[in-house]
Amino acid sequence: MKIYQFPTFRVETQLFHSPGAGYDGGLTSGGAQFITPEPGGFSMLEIAPALIDTEWDAPLASWIMSKISGQVFRVRLAPSPQIAFSRQRGMVAVPWSNGQAWSNQENWDGDFTAVYAAAALKGAITMSFDLTGVGPIVLPGHVVGHGSETYLVDEISYVGNVGTAIVTPPLRRNIAVGDNCYLRPWFTGRINNGADIRSAYDNMGHVKPGNIVLQEAVV
């Protein structure tokens, strides 16, 4: 299966969330609940791009708009409040301290990579990771990653710098001791709202695509 690398561009908003295993419907007077094929639910990533003024130089917006027929993307999450980064560590190494533009999404403290401190099996909802070097900065509401999957931290407790977290959705693959734990993770998914993205396209070179909604692809 071909997996495309999602391009890096400025974003106004980004939100990773896991809607859950079921949702209510109105098929009967008492309502109905539909269960997704993924036990424990699935995850989604919503991105609101900022204005893109480089379309004539690199037509990435139109390229994304053409990939709405089930193509799979690997997306690096942009810096956001869901990324545990330098706000917890002091404003020391962030790009704006040396005049660089922070919007390039590079060189953030959130790029720190921890290691997993315990093995965990696919389908589990608990993981342990060692944050030696940055300290216990990951809190409920932050995201962490393993491989090309992202997980939302629901609960976490610490013994020193080792955190044990309950996460959603359940683990998509086995974790081994020493595997990388990404504080700025990757997400693998498919775009499911192509018409919304295309509606704002024009040929003037100043493009602000509509919100991009990616639904998790388990590959």
Segments from the language model and where they lie:
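Extracellular/virion structural assembly segments
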Residues: 1-219
